[in-house]
Amino acid sequence: MTNIRNKPAPWIVRAADRGAHMERISHRALPVTMIFILIVGSAVAQETNGQKTTLKELVISALETHERIEIAQSNIRRAQADKKLARSAIMPRINVNGGYTFYGREASIELSPGEEFVIQPAQDWSWSADLRQTLFYGLRPWRAKNIARLNYDIAKLDKQTTINNLTLEVAASFLSTRAAEEGVEVRRVALEQIEGQLKVAERRYEVGEATIADVARWRAEVAGAKQAYVVVKGDAEFARHSLARLTGIEELGSLERLGPVPIPLGDSDTLISTAFEDRWEMKTLYNQLEAAGLWVKLEKGAFLPELDATAQYFQQKSAFPAQGWASLVFSLRVPIYQGGLVKANVAKAREDLRQVELLDQTLRRTIADQVDRAYIGYAAADAALDAARERTNAATEAYRQMERAFRVGEASSVDLLDSTTEAIDAETTHIIARAQREFQAISLRHAIGLFPLPDLDYAEFDKAEE
């Protein structure tokens, strides 16, 4: 089987490898006209009588059940908790303290004969209400609050990225499974027709119109066709089971054929510019850059003085020095020398910022490569589909001519086998080319930041989930 690109998508490579393996096992024989009639009739009956499953339904199920989405949602909840934690550092602290103390003896001062002032009772209690508020901490709590807000936005963007990537994975599995099932139908009909040709060859041998070599050749062809059918059927079943596990659906209906997926307009450069603006990864990077810059400022804040205020109301059993009082204390701490700790933390934060800035170059280059690959891949896949369609038509006509020639003795069984082999190859290539064209269209939408499926809006799904 011929690849339509030097580097096709991985799932297409697997499908092509399976097709090549099938071709090495099964060699020849297939009346193309009958194949088209039986395949179309079987597909129509299956989609009419059985339950149909669309790609959109599979994607929605995967988004609702896959653990990667749950992990992304968990990261959002953690980021939300971090926001509350950072906000709490700005708020005041209120504590109520109490204690009950037993002393070995009572201590008192004799003021006059018969009159004493107890300064330490044998049993004493006290309680206080304390309010502490940071007045200035080098703006570090405010920086931390802004960083937590950015991390929350990053977590939400990461979830959107996960959704797009999972959608692309489901689409690849869906199209691969659909192509595998169509390949099974091709091989099934081919096997039936080859078995029919074997019966014809045996009857012709009985009347002396064919040799024993012709019969042996058709018997070998039947054996190869049976083996090819078993192989492709097993591959299709595995692909179907894998798709069911990926999407969280126990029983899949018949996979509804995916219509032409619309692609975004514009040339490669225009689409790359669009991707730089709309890709979730770029939006995430902008937040990471801002957060890294704030982290440098946060670490620099440790050079600045710290000012705290503490208000307290205190009450005790003892009357010494008083049974109750209120106080307000301002505490100022000026860092003089900390062993180079702050300077080292600032240097680390600056390097983190530098790495994020370098990541911008890497990400832009990666996105540009993805868009170029998807853009060129779609053009190649579309051309390959046209070529496969023409090849199928040509193989159909060639088989008809060869079959007529074989009937009148102008062509041998080897010639008929060759023409039917070409028909099988052409139809299999057509199936894979059609699936690859749709996958490349979905990949192109994904590469520029659009939701891969045009009929599924992420915003609606996210709103429904909340």
Where are these regions (language model features)?
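Bacterial N-terminal signal peptides that target proteins for export
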Residues: 4-32
